[in-house]
Regions:
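Extracytoplasmic/periplasmic solute-binding protein
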Residues: 131-140, 145, 170-219, 261
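Gram-negative bacterial Sec-dependent N-terminal signal peptides
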Residues: 1-21
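Conserved N-terminal structural module of periplasmic/extracytoplasmic solute-binding proteins
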Residues: 8, 21-98, 109-116, 161, ...
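Glycine-centered hinge/linker elements that transmit conformational signals in sensory
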Residues: 173-175, 215-246
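Immediate post-signal peptide segment of exported/extracytoplasmic ligand-binding proteins
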Residues: 21-27, 48-54, 132-134, 155, ...
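Hinge/lid segment of periplasmic solute-binding proteins
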Residues: 87-144, 170, 196-200
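Short, solvent-exposed loop/beta-turn-alpha elements that line the ligand-binding surface or hinge
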Residues: 105-120, 204-229
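Alpha-to-beta junction loops
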Residues: 75-86, 100-102, 181-183, 258-265
Length: 265
């Protein structure tokens, strides 16, 4: 429930019943560290200052995976938080956890709160919406791939504008290599940027059954010719120095920070 990143992220509601009191504490487990963690604290502080009925208590629980597994363990121990942030990779897990979560669409219906899923971007809510159109969770900190490039290295290579297509990525990278760059580009979160988002951009599903939303008997379609061709191309570029693999998740970012690679996403 968006993850990626990271990580396409969302808030999966697992609201526990509490007795009425002067100020109800709402514990919110999240996976936002560093600057994003500070922002989460600001959001909570602003909300707390805006009214006197509820007190949001944000709690950092580590990585996306650690936060989700911690929430599952807490639920089994009957010590779950009121709200937990779960990345999109955990969507299927949350969809199958009927008793662990309170689906947002049902929560809003039961509490008679005004709620319109169309207020959110369909490309984002699609991650967390069933085939019947029911939104299971609220998008939060949803991610999208962004291309970063080093302007100084581009200027040295005589490149005026960043590439907009994979063909242009290859052409620009060759110019960068010719100007002395050690590699053209690297990427982070490869399965997300080079499979999932590549598929979305080219309207190629990563799985059958409506990308898994239509049933549990779902199979991946990584062997689709579009994916195979793209990954083969990445392998070719890697051998030529156009692309350099820097590791899983965000481990490839230092290749850009140190100016070894002129671009990253």
């Amino acid at each position: 429930m968006a993850i990626k990143h990271l990580a396409g992220l969302a808030i999966a509601a697992a609201f526990i019943s509490t007795q009425a009191q002067a100020k109800t504490e709402v514990e919110w487990w999240h996976a936002m560290g560093g600057a994003l963690g500070k922002k989460v604290n600001e959001i909570a502080a602003d909300f707390n200052a805006s009214q006197s009925e509820y007190e949001i208590k944000p709690v950092y629980k580590g990585s996306y995976a650690e936060t989700m597994t911690s929430a599952i363990a807490a639920f089994r121990a009957k010590e779950q938080p009121a709200i937990v942030q779960v990345f999109e990779v955990g969507t299927a897990t949350m969809m199958g956890a009927d008793k662990a979560i309170y689906p947002v669409y049902q929560l809003m219906k039961d509490t008679k709160e005004s709620f319109n899923p169309d207020d959110y971007l369909a490309a984002v809510t699609g991650y967390y919406t069933t085939n019947e159109g029911n939104m299971l969770s609220l998008p939060f900190n949803s991610s999208t791939p962004v291309l970063y490039y080093n302007k100084d290295m581009f200027k040295k290579a005589g490149v005026a504008n960043p590439p907009k297509t994979w063909k242009e990525m290859e052409e620009v990278s060759r110019k960068l290599l010719a100007s002395g760059a050690k590699c053209g580009f690297s990427t982070t979160w490869q399965s997300w940027t080079q499979i999932e988002n590549f598929g979305a951009r080219n309207n190629v599903p990563v799985a059958n059954n409506n990308n898994g939303f239509a049933g549990l008997d779902t199979k991946f379609k990584f062997n689709d010719s579009a994916f195979v061709h793209h990954i083969e191309q990445m392998g070719k570029w890697s051998k030529e120095g156009i692309f350099k693999y820097g590791g899983r998740q965000s481990d490839g970012m230092p290749l850009f920070y140190t100016q070894e690679c002129a671009m990253t996403m």
